[in-house]
Amino acid sequence: LEFQTEDGKTFMDGSAVAQAKAATITNDTGNKENIVELTLTDEGAKTFAEVTSANVGKALPIVYDDEVISYPTVQQAITGGTAQISGMANYEEAESLASQIRIGSLSLKLEEMRSEVVGAQLGEEAISSSLKAAAIGLVIVMIFMIVQYLVPGVVAAFALAIYTTLVIATLYLFEITLTLPGIAGIILSIGMAVDANVIIFARIREEIADGKSVATAIETGFARARSAILDGNITTLIAAAVLGLRGSGTVKGFASTLAIGIILSMFTCMVVTKVLMHAVYAIGVRDAKFYGKAKERKPFDFVGKTGIFIAISCAIIVCGCVGVGMHKSSDGTILNYSLEFKGGTSTAVVMDKQYSIKEIDKEIVPLVEKITGDGNVQAQAVEGTKQIIIKTRTLSLEERTKLEKTMTKNFGVDKKDITSESISSTVSNEMKTDAIVAVVIATICMLLYIWFRFKDVRFAGSAVIALSHDVIMVFICYVLAWISVGNTFIACMLTIIGYSINNTIVIFDRIRDALKKHHAQTKAAYKEIVNKSIAQTMSRSVNTSITTFVMVLVLYIMGVTSIREFALPLMVGLLAGTYSSICLASEIWYLLRTKGMKKE
């Protein structure tokens, strides 16, 4: 807050104001008038007396945050340390001005809680490589769909093109900033969008195999696939919603694009794909051979091999836990917490050559320690690149600027190749708490939805066990691969939870349909239903996993380091989720459902 003369010179700041309040008085003419009463400090009163004495009849603008908030004219010299500003239209206007003056008079010191500075070249390269990955992955998925599903595959390719266009248009319409996690959300949603088409086409093939006409098969296939599509997408949408409400800025970017992708994928598969399928049929493509026919699969005894599946999972988890223990004994910690969860400053620098760890410790670390006064500087090289990552305590803006200048001067680094991120310990603790709450809330909501939809707590119970299996697998991946654990860790976990539940729901949906038709009374009957349901959905489970995995794999190959750290555990989670949905979830439901039941 500044008090200025007409020529723009500041003669007094907000510290000279002791009090400012709105009031309504009766003036000399007997009319009520709304004013602001100013009470000045002793030093302020002295300065104000001198300036007003020399500026009678002139204006003394009051400026707050570079904006003139009042333009009062001096009627007479003010020497008593109090002043009145008149001319307000109503009391609310007077109160607003008084409030601004009070706020401006406070002695506030801003403390930087979080900052992120990205070099222009790094940002452009990251966005460019991620978008290329999305385009390549999309083309691969389209080719796979055409080869696998013939005419419906061509329809799916067109629907995917329309879907992608709608996503881009929506992002542009709502002016959603495209971040790297946001692009990851788009790429993942493209892979998951294929799932709905795969479910529909599998149902259509089954209807044709049952002897129905193509026209009837198309209509019935869409109708029978609807419940599985809605249930699977709603559970993933729940995860996206929780991420959007509880996550930080970068995670919200991932959540928003994922949510948009899910909503638009449901629209394109249930409306666009259906219209295109009917259009293809209408122009004369009516022979069943163009649509494919479901092959009769001899059900594999998945239920009978439950013990083997559980033993395999337990063996992997035990080996992983041993690796975790060895990792802790050598490094002293289990997880590689990123800045979001522990606070500090991370500076990424693209050097003019690849540096070894010894060179970094000898040439770079001592300089950073000297600048920052931090004796615990951590620096590492990004494998296969010229980039190094320097982690320190939280640095001030001045310290970051000094570090930047030093790197530019001593190593010839271009300023645009330096990226820095700072997070205070306060923010990191809040983010860690929000992350835990987000996972718990999302998981509970998804499981409650399953319970509500399937009217059987055993479905939810078996889903919990399968999800725990997937989460443990991904956790082990983070530990052994020493991947940074931050907000993308939460995004990855919730994505895997949503994906795994989606896979599991498709099989549960088949079991539910079978239970409506066949009133099973024995273990053998339930065993047959479960084995047949898994066999019927096997092609869908495998094909969906392949398309989603391909999208993430391309992202891993072409993405920058931060994206790779998201894609790698995501691929592990996709494999674990596919395995658990096929080999564990339904089998565990069978064990819970038939507990205490006679074999025959």
Predicted features along the sequence, with ranges:
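Non-transmembrane, solvent-exposed regions of membrane trafficking/translocation machinery
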Residues: 1-74, 83, 97, 450
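Small-residue-enriched core segments of transmembrane alpha-helices in multipass membrane transport
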Residues: 153-175, 186-193, 254-269, 460-481, ...
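Pore- and gate-forming transmembrane helices of large, multi-pass membrane proteins
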Residues: 121-141, 192, 210-248, 301-302, ...
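Transmembrane helices with small-residue packing motifs
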Residues: 296-353
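Cytosolic juxtamembrane regions of multi-pass inner-membrane proteins
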Residues: 191-232, 278-285, 483-544, 590-600
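Interfacial segments of transmembrane alpha-helices in multi-pass membrane proteins
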Residues: 36-37, 41-62, 123-124, 128-179, ...
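Hydrophobic alpha-helical transmembrane segments of membrane transport and translocation systems
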Residues: 206-317, 558-600
